[in-house]
Regions:
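Residue-level marker for buried hydrophobic side chains located in beta-strands
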Residues: 37-38, 260
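Active-site surface patch of divalent metal-dependent phosphodiester/phosphate bond hydrolases
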Residues: 32, 36, 48-183
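Catalytic metal-binding/acid-base residues of hydrolase active sites
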Residues: 43, 75, 222-224, 264-267
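A long, amphipathic alpha-helix that forms part
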Residues: 229-253
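Beta-strand-turn-beta hairpins that frame and shape the catalytic cleft
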Residues: 26-37, 120-123, 138-155, 189-221, ...
C-alpha cells in the first residue's frame, strides 16, 4: 500500500488516538487569552483531488488550532488552499502571493506562499509585499565578485553555447534529435537574489479590551534547498541581513517587530556544530541592540524537558523549519525566556505537532523510531505526499 495513503478505518484510528491525548503529539490547545502562530509546509498544496476527504479533514482539524498559519508549497492551483480554509471554519481568512520561483510561461518549479488567519484574534493591516534585493544591491554584488562569478559560470556557459548550436542545427533539419537543454547547476560564490521571494504581511494580534495589540510583520519564507550547502547559507544569511537592517530602522518600519515563519531548509552537514554556529551567529545580534531590540529562534534550543531540539521533517532527522522573532516590543519572549517555556497554559510556549509518531502509534502500535529502516521507508511513502513531508511548528504568545 506504499504511496496509497490511509484507508477510512485507518483514519478513524488516527483520529481516536489523537483525540485521546492531543498534547502527547504536540498539538496545542485553543486557550483563551493566547494566540498561536504556526508554520506548515504542506507538500504540493494544489488541487482538491490531490488528497482524500479524510486527509483534508485531518489537515483542517490540525490547522484550525492555529490563529496565524504560514503555509509553504502552495501551487498555482488554489482550490486546495481554498478548501482547507473553508474546512477550518468561517472565522478564517487568507492572503496568498502570486507564484514565485519561476518566470511566467517558463519551465520550473514555482509556488505560492500564504497566510491563513483567525479574524477573531488576528487582524491583517495595510502592508503586503515580497522581500527582494534591489537592482543596485545585485549589481554591486556582481561587481565585487565578478571574477568569481565568471569562473563559476564558465562551464555552464560552454554547455549552453553547445546546446544553442545543436538546437539551431535541429531547427535547420541538420540534426534529427532535438538537444536537451543543460541543467543550470552552478555553485554561485555570492548571493544575488532569492530563488523564491519571501512574503511579508503586517498583522495585529488583538488582546483584551483596552490593551495594545501585538503588531508585527509576518514573513513567510521557503528558502532554497538546491545542490550546495553554500547556496542555502547564502539565502538564509541574506534574509537575516534584510530583517536586521529593517529592524535597525525602527520608526521607519511599519511595525518594528518581525516574525519569520517558514521552511528555511536549515539542514546541516555536521548537525551539532553547524546548529551551534547558527545559534551563536543569531544571538550575537542581541548585544548589538542592547535592550532596544532582540532576536530569538526558540527552535534552536531544546524545549524544557527535552534533551534535543525538535525535528520538523517527516523523517525526524532535521529541523528544516523555524520560527524567528526580531523585535523591539517588550511583550515578545527573548532567548533567555526559552528555558521557561510551557509553564503556564496561556504563557509562552512552542512545539511541533508530531503527526509522524501519531500515525505510527495509531497504526503500528509503536513510535516511528521503533520500526526497522525498511518499515520506516514503506510507512513514510504512505503519507509524505498525501499529508506532507514536513510537520507544523507553532509558537504561543500570551495576549496583552
Amino acid at each position: 500500500m506504499a504511496g496509497q495513503g490511509f484507508t477510512r478505518s485507518e483514519w478513524n484510528k488516527i483520529r481516536e488516538t489523537l483525540e485521546s491525548d492531543p498534547a502527547r503529539y504536540g498539538l496545542p490547545d485553543r486557550v483563551y487569552g493566547s494566540v498561536v502562530l504556526a508554520s506548515f509546509n504542506i507538500r504540493k498544496l494544489g488541487s482538491t483531488s490531490s488528497r482524500t476527504k479524510d486527509t483534508w479533514e485531518f489537515l483542517a482539524y490540525v490547522c484550525r488550532r492555529f490563529d496565524l498559519l504560514a503555509v509553504q508549497e502552495i501551487q498555482d492551483e488554489l482550490s486546495g488552499l481554498r478548501k482547507l480554509q473553508e474546512l477550518m471554519g468561517p472565522e478564517f481568512d487568507m492572503i496568498v502571493s502570486d507564484k514565485t520561483g519561476v518566470f511566467p510561461g517558463e519551465p520550473g518549479v514555482g509556488e505560492r506562499l500564504g497566510f491563513i488567519f483567525n479574524r477573531s484574534i488576528v487582524r491583517r493591516t495595510e502592508i503586503a509585499t515580497d522581500i527582494s534585493y534591489d537592482r543596485s544591491k545585485v549589481l554591486n554584488a556582481i561587481s565585487r565578485h565578478n571574477d568569481e562569478i565568471h569562473a563559476a559560470m564558465a562551464p555552464y556557459a560552454k554547455k549552453l553555447r553547445n546546446y544553442i548550436a545543436m538546437l539551431e542545427e535541429f531547427d535547420a533539419g541538420i540534426r534529427s534529435t532535438k538537444p536537451k537543454k543543460p541543467k543550470f547547476n552552478v555553485k554561485m560564490p555570492t548571493f544575488l537574489t532569492f530563488i523564491r521571494a519571501p512574503l511579508c504581511v503586517s498583522f495585529e494580534a488583538m488582546g483584551h479590551p483596552g490593551t495594545n495589540p501585538y503588531q508585527f510583520m509576518a514573513i513567510n519564507a521557503h528558502l532554497y534547498y538546491g545542490d550546495y550547502m553554500s547556496d542555502r547559507r547564502q539565502e538564509f544569511d541574506a534574509l537575516m541581513e534584510w530583517i536586521i537592517a529593517r529592524l535597525r530602522e525602527n520608526d521607519k518600519a511599519y511595525y518594528p517587530n518581525f516574525i519569520l515563519l517558514g521552511d528555511l531548509n536549515l539542514d546541516f552537514d555536521k548537525p551539532e556544530t553547524d546548529r551551534a554556529r547558527i545559534e551563536k551567529h543569531l544571538k550575537a545580534f542581541n548585544p548589538q541592540f542592547g535592550d532596544d531590540a532582540h532576536v530569538n529562534f526558540p527552535f534552536l534550543d531544546p524545549h524544557p524537558g527535552r534533551n534535543e531540539v525538535f525535528r520538523t521533517n517527516a523523517r525526524l532527522n532535521e529541523t528544516f523549519d523555524q520560527i524567528g522573532l526580531f523585535f523591539r516590543d517588550k511583550h515578545f519572549p527573548t532567548h533567555l525566556d526559552n528555558a521557561n517555556m510551557g509553564q503556564d497554559e496561556r504563557g509562552f510556549d512552542y512545539g511541533v505537532f508530531g503527526f509522524v509518531n501519531l500515525f505510527s502509534e495509531a497504526l503500528n502500535n509503536k513510535p516511528m523510531a521503533a520500526l526497522t529502516n525498511d518499515a520506516k521507508k514503506k510507512f513514510l511513502a504512505r503519507f509524505e505526499h498525501k499529508v506532507s513531508d514536513h510537520m507544523p511548528l507553532w509558537l504561543r504568545l500570551p495576549l496583552p
